[in-house]
């Protein structure tokens, strides 16, 4: 999906902002002799950025606004190096809440729902993202945070939670505990918004069946606001993403060239109106594809397919590139295999 004229102008404005701010990113653009973009060709010639680049800006080098305009920071986990610190202005926080509100609305969630939020809070974007969007929607939020399953189930029963926001692994744990404790008839859940982890069809069906709820995939990453930049609809045929806030292109992860709509590749995201820390052509390493055509739900927003894995998940087996998602596609054909499995690669005689 080629960048349109409006998006191109927005990217150009983001570039001007970064250069003027003389931030880490602005200096990088100057080093490449970039002063702006006015065509698709200009845009596709822009350099990519990656998490390893952003770590070089630690702690606040990505900040593209005066400090008095920054109201919050979030960060990546930093498990493989320095964390990436992302500053937010008040407008960024509000824009994120607006996008998340759209996610809830796309999932058929209303201000009459009671939304139980189980992902973590703090520097991580997940918990507060789910909460801000629910408050923008006008729904009741039950801000549980992670763990403490006994308390989670008590609040779920006593407060009559109707929406569960969770990772796939924790929602499965809750489903198992609800069954084990005989609480199924006391639970009022009707929908689940699931993110942060890739999950297969078998796991999805198991959670849906055991909890008796509709499930929706939500997409996002800390560097680009957080969760809430896209979500699946009731037709479950991809995730609608908000192309008035972000531009998504799919590239060949080896050549870096854009691929046609419908072809699998790496997701690359550019922010269109972010203030605190704009990002241009950010390589996510997530694998997906743009789904061509309109969705049955009638939404005007384009769609990404479910995340199929990551470029850094790839294994090379006897010279063949293999992704865990490809193995999962084969395993799901066997009904006797559960949603949980382990991949072990044996090396015999050095092969």
Residue ranges and their predicted role:
Residues 1-75, 80-98, 102-106, 110-112, ...:
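Nucleotide 5′-phosphate-binding alpha/beta core
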